[in-house]
Amino acid sequence: MGNVPGKEQQVRNARSVSEDYHREGQVRSKRPSAPREKKREPRVFVDPNEQVDGGYLVPQGVYTGPQDFDILVVKSLMTSRKLAPFFKGLQDYEEEWTDHQLMAAIRGFPIPSAASESPTTESTDTKDASASTSTPHAISTPSHLSPPTAPPQVAISPPRHTLSSNNPFRDPLEHMSHLRIDLDNTTFSQSAPTPSWMRSGEPDQEDGDELINPGILQSPPSREAPKPPPSRQRAKTLTNKEPPLMVKIYRDPIECPICFLYYPNSLNMTRCCAQPICSECFVQMKRAEPHPRHDEPEPDTLLGQLDLISEPTACPYCAMSDFGVVYSPRHGPGAKAAGANSADAAAAKGNGDESAIDDSGDSSDGIDTTNMDDVADKLMHMSGAKRRSSISVTNPNVVTVDRVRPDWSKTLAAARARAARKAATANALHATAFVEGGNGEVAGSSRSSRRTRQNHEQRQAARAQELEQIMLSEAMRLSMLESQEAEEKRSREQESK
């Protein structure tokens, strides 16, 4: 029992353990809390399956700034074909470019020369002939040589024309074209009897034909060159006769006057002056930040600071207010919807239909395409007329900046509330300073006469009257703003009618 600690030692050990526990708890409590991770913005990935009229539903990286527009609203407008999709812009374009060169520019490859265009139109028969010629079917040996003891090995040579990895028209099955060899003609066995036409010492011909030198290839007399499968023949025919779909879409493009990139000729058109603008540039436009009115006589006053406005976006070409665009969808090759309609578009393409959009007034998506065509015709007439007219903002086919950024009203309301709180704080500080200054003056002038106290009371009454006038003028200003907004609303309704 000598090893058992005494009672005093047990109490001391318990105290040390409790002190260590409390000390450790304090240390743990004093540890700074880990900083909260900032809320990351959701990343937008390009999905090649989501396409409309040959363009994507997400930006293509023309602008590297923050994409603070409503991406869901933009996708909805593009899917309903009221806004042009995000096309991939071309840095340059030449009318003399061939389909091969244009396809290389679309895919971002170096532009090849017209003379160095790869032989994509080579006939299948030529390749088959070259493949059959390169295969040693039989070797005739002289009479003084013994027949080979081992079966000859088949030498498969690649095709004469190989396509580079940067070729935009590259066939995914091109690397297998040299494997079209009839294995029955090239498979030999030592146990199998030697055909009569391969026997070197016993020729079948009675007239004594000359022996063929060794190393010269011969094909069986009763064999024919293998034919390519029908799918390969069909692919070659389509490649030779018809250019790819993207080449048709990007042929004769137009240049965006803002980003100076070339896009397909079915871009957005401004409602006021019928000028083209791509969707990349359109979604970057926004209203100005809330600011006081510029036409106020004294914008630095309290009333001027409270009256904040956010003016609508003006047209970058003609400076007309309420900037909006109109999109005329493509009719013909490449016209297809995205999302749920991708399967229908693929089925239409498999059936050989060049257009997935009905030319009649009623489309599969419930969109009035006839109305869109009328708007497009009106825009074309506007561009050629001497006196240009504009399409109304209330037109259902016009997409304004406010539709792409619907949170502008919340931003304006927050700015006005912030300015009102700032003004209220300033008024409270001024009133407190005035009251404290008056009390000090009364306490310091205890020996003054009754006349001084009357002056102080008059100043207080004047200050109260001034505050009352400020509140009255603020109420009048708010009522005038409400009446002005009501008049503008009535005028817009009359214009729309």
UniProtKB/Swiss-Prot annotation:
It is found in: Cytoplasm. The keyword Transmembrane does not apply. Keywords: Cytoplasm. CDD domains: SIP5-like (cd24139). Residues 112-135 have a biased composition (Low complexity). GO terms for cellular component: cytoplasm. Residues 1-52, 112-172, 185-240, 348-371, 438-497 are annotated as: Disordered. Residues 136-146, 185-194 have a biased composition (Polar residues). Residues 17-27, 34-44, 486-497 have a biased composition (Basic and acidic residues). Belongs to the SIP5 family. May negatively regulate the SNF1 kinase. PANTHER family: PROTEIN SIP5. This is Protein SIP5. The lineage of its organism: Eukaryota, Fungi, Dikarya, Ascomycota, Saccharomycotina.
